[in-house]
Amino acid sequence: MDRRSLALLMVVVMMSPLTGSIAASSSASTQGGTRHAEAQIVEPDHLTSVPEQSDIWWDPHSNWWDVTTLDMDRNGIHDSIQEAVGPVNVGLSFTRAFTDSDRQILLSMGFEIRQELPVVDAVLLGAIDPTEAVGLSQIDGVAMVERYGSLVFYGDVQTPAVKASNSSDYPIGAWDLGLSGSGINIAMVDTGVDNEHPGLVGKFVAGYDAVCYVHSDPQCILAGGREDDGSFDPDDGNQHGTACMGMASATGLEADGTQSQFYGSAPDAGLVDVRIGTDVGAGPFENYLLEQEFYESAMNGLQWIIDHRDDAWPGVEKEWHGIDIISLSWGITSHEDGGSDGSDMHSRILDEAMELGVVVSNAAGNSGEDNDGLSGMSASSLSITVAATDDKNTVNRTDDEIAGYSSRGPRKDNGDGNPLNELIPEISAPGTNIVQAEACVTSGSCNNFLGGDASENTYTGRGSGTSYATPAVSGIIALVMEANSELTPLQIKEVLKHTSELRGEPSAPEVDPYWNREFGYGMVDALASVELAIFLRDSGQTGSIDPTLQSHGLNLTQTDVINITGHAWGQAGSVDRVEYRVGSGPWHEATYSDPPGELGALTPFLWHVILDPKELEEGQHIVEVHASSGDSHSLPVFYEVTGEGGGASSRGIPTAALGLVVLVAMGWAGSLVLARMRSPDEEEAAIDAELVD
């Protein structure tokens, strides 16, 4: 071998270890595992594809009337009607839309139709003799003869405690992100709202009086009854409605123009004032003199909201059109042992509202720990049911407890085989000893009946109840909707659950590892909710979020490796994969623990993201993880990790590119050696050749 060949061989031999060391980042063993997807490490006992999961065992398309516990003998009659003595108020729920033919049949049988509820394919008939229920149940298309329920109203530090406003305990609140509920309308369905109150001035965009009594507002009678175009502005003859709207949206202004700290969660949200109760038969401390009319008014008000949810209200700007949120601080008692199972028409109408794009926030009830089940409304399968905490009159949440009066779950089983919709309440918020905006009726010198108003009133008198926790959540929903207008009601519900502060041990771990019968999925966190809503908006992920896909982080450790562990499962089907990314980088699939046996439906499996910090650029990085199925995925979880900047990927240069650089360097070095080993004659010839014209 001549000198030139020997020199070239020596260069190649000396350079080859360098190429090997660079290529090793995609295949070398680290900490007992192998490399996978740049910085990821796959442990030997981990799976690289998602474990197989069993299908759900219930039929998600079953008809409520085929499974409801309200009619155990399946004769089409609410069981409590068959036990009643004397007149009972009833409605008919149909398996299809109510028709003119049905209307004529009822009239021919001598029944008056008091209210039609097309959104739930139902009509209200009022009082009948219980013996007439059999004939009604035999009308073609009748799913069930239902009994009316009885309506019950559930009745400073609240806003900073939910992290809407900032405080010394929580220096950043949702308002600090530029959110206040502007452009979002809350339908306060209650005893009316005195929106002349200094903290509620300018909020009214529309209203409707679902029940018109002279005792509460003579203007209703003088105007000729109800106006259904949204132009009527009801007053509050009780106090309950004004107090609730204040907790959702008060600005804190006083009559003299000074600023108090008595804000609602969304101080710039608008008011759609839907009165369903009055000072006769409606208040929490009154006799129910007009129970039948009260129930019908409540259903009438909810039907009106759904019918007018997209209306352009008279005299208001386009941004204030429609109805975004229903806030309900009352319930409907059940006639069955164990409370409502959510299949009654007053629960179903809330489910329909959620599916039609109106978010429903409703109170869990004030029956405490040993309650006889949740009421209708509180038992709705899809709406957001709110429990109340006692904040001990402090902003700091560490001392908060569930309020003694707050109704506990779960809801009565509705017979559909799905255990998830029994996990109510879903969320909790402060509801104890809350300062109220004063309605006109609370002041001795003010009475709507005499033409007075609440314009000189202030914020006094403390009240407690899930009534008062609910509007705080309604205001937070307004903040979330303002932050991300593309979120659906069910996505918003999932955002609130996902970002809540966990409290209490899981009450049904075989169904869900996080739900607690007192707190639901935890204490609502306005700041975390709007931060997540903004992230989904800015990252373009909103349309891909499936609320039935679950992924939650469990643990992060960082020593020689970064080890993130969590679990995932599907609530309506299987998870295809769990994915992660570092910063805005490409998505990679996580690895999985091998489960000891077959995974049943609703059973979480463990996922892992194990990274070499030396392969990440020096500094802090956000790792984002979600569970996916098809083109949809769960809400993400985030972990902050520290890169140590020791690897190729940390410099942003792919391994293949580095290998190419080395090969080029080898070629250059080899050519240099060859050039230096040329004979003098060869070198001179080369120079002469370059000088030729």
What are these regions (language model features)?
Residues 1-35, 645-693:
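Secretory targeting signatures
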Residues 5-124, 129-173, 644:
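Autoinhibitory N-terminal propeptides
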Residues 56-83, 168, 172, 211-235, ...:
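Surface-exposed intrinsically disordered loops and tails
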Residues 63, 323-327, 482-571:
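C-terminal subdomain of the subtilisin-like protease fold in secreted/lumenal serine endopeptidases
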Residues 173-208, 212-296, 319-324, 355, ...:
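Subtilisin-like serine protease catalytic core
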Residues 208-214, 378-478, 482:
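Extracellular S/T/G-rich loop segment that most often corresponds to the catalytic His/Ser-adjacent loop
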Residues 302-340, 363:
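Short acidic, glycine-rich surface-loop motifs adjacent to enzyme active sites
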Residues 544-555, 562-647:
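Long, low-complexity serine/threonine/glycine- and acidic-rich segments characteristic of extracellular
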